Amino acid sequence: MKRLLLSFLFTVAFGSCAFEVGEDELCFVGDSITYLWDLEYYFPNYITHKHAVSGAGLKQLDSWDVSDCKGRTTILLIGTNDIGYWKSTADGIERLREDYKDRFIKSAKRIGGKPMLIVSILPRNEWGKQDSLVNENIRAQNGVLRRSLKDIPDWEFVDVFDLFLDKGLQIREDLFKDGLHPND
């Protein structure tokens, strides 16, 4: 599944001219999902910079030195560790979504990637123990991000959320090894 996701990103990036002609370096920033990507395999003709740590969220990202991403095409996939346990029925959920969106934009701007491809937060069912309310919330948070990022120059929100779903808001079990990390 990682191949499908990365191929999709590559197609979107080139289809929307996100990669500059002659560009030879790409930056990837994220959590364990990004950490597990074999960038040398998927992008053999590029020098890649990877800033990704298992369990990372925005708080951790804000402490990383990502200065090598400034001005470079950057792919950002982070968020499941920040909001992956929220339920859409939680008290104050709208305030939480707006606060997360503001922190997300601030963190992404600090990276300084140009252009910036922001990948939607993926659905999940970690070890088969989460209910679909978690994915309902992730879908809603992706919507907040999509609407908020659309007018930021040189940023593209790449929504792959539905590609990972089966019926309803259940994940496609065949695409995840543990309900969280996409298969190879």
How does the language model describe each region?
Residues 1-3:
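Positively charged n-region of N-terminal signal peptides that target proteins for export
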Residues 7, 16-74:
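Serine-esterase "nucleophile elbow" of acetyl-processing enzymes
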Residues 11-12:
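Repetitive helical segments and hydrophobic/amphipathic motifs
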Residues 42-47, 62-184:
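Alpha-helical cap/lid subdomain in secreted, periplasmic
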